[in-house]
Curated annotation (Swiss-Prot):
GO CC annotation: membrane; monoatomic ion channel complex; plasma membrane
Residues on Cytoplasmic side: 1-62, 124-131, 181-235
Name of the protein described by the UniProt record: Voltage-gated hydrogen channel 1
Coiled-coil zones: 187-228
MF terms in GO: voltage-gated proton channel activity
Role noted for this protein: Mediates the voltage-dependent proton permeability of excitable membranes. Forms a proton-selective channel through which protons may pass in accordance with their electrochemical gradient.
């Protein structure tokens, strides 16, 4: 399974480290020294660049919550458009609701398109090393182009029966967006759990070392008591 999952990374992930992590999860147990090497504190940086700020923003929890919220709203808008296309819900006489839904959905797509542009600018070539991000950007760009075409040629697509098919293409964007957001959140949780695990492992090692020292101290005191006849040899 790891040989497939290792390809689905997002920007900010180290592909080599990502592959190694899956192999370590399959083995389930690693030495404490190897765990220490997996988690490294970020080095102190004297000068914070715009790219650094944007990378921190893209990996922040609030940003992911906003993206998930926009994806859910987009899903509801596309669902509403599909229901009206299938005549399950009848729009108003002047067809204002479909246009409002379409413009709102196009606005959300514009936000996603800007996000993709900033990610390419911030991460550069690293962006194209992560297939999940590339797939997401392709779906966003294609969906944006199709929505623009539908905005001016909707009647032509409706006449040939392609309108519903194009709406369904947006579902691919929604599903991919949800998977990407959930995966990023999961990566953050895994990172936090690994940090907690490292702290606990360090604490256990300290306690074990302390126990060994206590046992050695007890043995030393026992020998001293026996030497001075304060403790019988049978004790």
């Amino acid at each position: 399974m790891s040989r497939y999952l290792k390809h689905f990374t997002v920007v900010g992930d180290d592909p080599i480290q990502w592959s190694n992590d899956y192999q370590k999860w399959e083995n389930e147990e690693e030495d404490n020294g190897e765990k220490d090497s997996e988690i490294k504190l970020e080095p102190s940086r004297g000068h914070v660049t715009f790219q650094d700020v944007m990378k921190k923003l893209f990996s922040s929890r609030r940003f992911q919550i906003v993206i998930v919220f926009l994806v859910i709203v987009d899903a509801l808008l596309v669902l509403g458009e599909l229901l009206m296309d299938l005549k399950i819900i009848h729009p108003d006489k002047y067809h204002i609701a479909p246009k409002v839904f379409h413009y709102l959905s196009l606005s959300i797509l514009t936000i996603f398109l800007v996000e993709v542009g900033f990610k390419i600018f911030v991460y550069g070539r690293e962006f194209f090393h992560h297939k999940f991000e590339v797939l997401d950007s392709i779906v966003v760009v294609v969906s944006f182009i199709l929505d623009l075409v539908l905005l001016f040629r909707e009647h032509e697509f409706e006449a040939v029966g392609l309108l519903i098919l194009l709406r369904l293409w947006r579902v691919a964007r929604i599903i991919n967006g949800i998977i990407l957001s959930v995966k990023t959140r999961s990566e953050q949780q895994v990172s936090k759990l690994k940090q907690v695990n490292l702290k606990l492992a360090t604490k256990v090692e300290q306690l074990q070392h302390s126990c060994v020292e206590k046992e050695q101290e007890i043995e030393r005191l026992t020998r001293m008591l026996k030497q001075h006849g304060l403790l019988s040899e049978q004790t």
